[in-house]
């Protein structure tokens, strides 16, 4: 496996630290007036999500992490695992609740949504839902005429269980387009 020197450190680089895969979030090169130069690095542990700060002397190396990002289609959830399939090879992978994170509330069974899955040694570490999804509103308060002062919104429960704020004109059984990164309503579908 390749090694990265402190000169190669940049945000987004995936490295191994204490036998855990990490992603570099920030890298600051420091050259004090006296003494050896060093790098102050902020890393996110990809297994636990914890952020840690480490200092490396100039010239230190870290091993590259065996991380692969693949695009896969979502198939179904069997209660404890979410199942995905590679559209070319038809290979299937199952991700647990920790790997799914927030993506679980945006995916519905048989939707065939394309997700980006981060694999470490063939095991899913993280699943990113598509940026935009279309879901049906299953529960929301009716919009009453004249209820528009301030242009506010109302909460709406979607078919996956997620709750988003929608404009007052959105009714039950309508489909809405949602940005999964922010959890915000975009438009009626």
UniProtKB/Swiss-Prot annotation:
**Pathway in which this enzyme or protein is active:** Protein biosynthesis; polypeptide chain elongation
Does the record's keyword annotation contain Protein biosynthesis?
yes
A cellular component term, taken from the record's GO annotations: cytoplasm
UniProt-listed GO biological process terms:
peptide biosynthetic process
Q: Which GO terms describe its molecular function?
A: translation elongation factor activity
Transmembrane regions: none
What does the UniProt entry say about where the protein is found? Answer: Cytoplasm
- Keyword field: Cytoplasm, Elongation factor, Hydroxylation, Protein biosynthesis
Q: What is its main location?
A: cytoplasm
Tell me which InterPro entries the record gives.
Elong-fact-P_C, NA-bd_OB-fold, Rib_uL2_dom2, Transl_elong_fac_P/YeiP, Transl_elong_KOW-like, Transl_elong_P/YeiP_cen, Transl_elongation_fac_P, Translation_prot_SH3-like_sf
SUPFAM superfamilies, alphabetized: Nucleic acid-binding proteins, Translation proteins SH3-like domain
One Pfam match, given by its short name, reads EFP_N
PTMs? Answer: May be beta-lysylated on the epsilon-amino group of Lys-34 by the combined action of EpmA and EpmB, and then hydroxylated on the C5 position of the same residue by EpmC (if this protein is present). Lysylation is critical for the stimulatory effect of EF-P on peptide-bond formation. The lysylation moiety may extend toward the peptidyltransferase center and stabilize the terminal 3-CCA end of the tRNA. Hydroxylation of the C5 position on Lys-34 may allow additional potential stabilizing hydrogen-bond interactions with the P-tRNA.
- N6-(3,6-diaminohexanoyl)-5-hydroxylysine: which positions carry it? 34
Query: What function does this protein fulfil?
Result: Involved in peptide bond synthesis. Alleviates ribosome stalling that occurs when 3 or more consecutive Pro residues or the sequence PPG is present in a protein, possibly by augmenting the peptidyl transferase activity of the ribosome. Modification of Lys-34 is required for alleviation.
Q: Which family does it belong to?
A: Belongs to the elongation factor P family.
Instruction: Supply the NCBIfam families for this chain.
Output: efp, PRK00529.1
Q: What is this protein called?
A: Elongation factor P
């Amino acid at each position: 496996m390749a090694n990265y020197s402190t000169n190669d450190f940049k945000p987004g680089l995936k490295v191994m630290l204490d036998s855990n895969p990490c992603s570099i979030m920030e890298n600051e090169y420091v050259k004090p007036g006296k003494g050896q130069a060093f790098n102050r690095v902020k890393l996110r542990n990809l297994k636990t999500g914890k952020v840690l700060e480490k200092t490396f002397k100039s010239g230190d190396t870290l091993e590259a992490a065996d991380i692969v990002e693949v695009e896969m289609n979502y198939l179904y959830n069997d209660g404890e695992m979410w199942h995905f399939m590679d559209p070319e090879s038809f290979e299937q992978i199952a991700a647990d609740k920790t790997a799914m994170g927030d993506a679980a509330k945006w995916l519905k069974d048989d939707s065939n949504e394309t997700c980006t899955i981060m694999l470490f040694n063939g095991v899913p570490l993280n699943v990113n839902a598509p940026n935009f999804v279309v879901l049906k509103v299953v529960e929301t308060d009716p919009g009453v005429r004249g209820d528009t002062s301030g242009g506010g919104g109302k909460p709406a429960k979607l078919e996956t269980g997620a709750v988003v704020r929608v404009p007052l004109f959105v009714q039950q059984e309508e489909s809405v387009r949602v940005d999964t990164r922010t959890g915000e309503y975009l438009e009626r579908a």
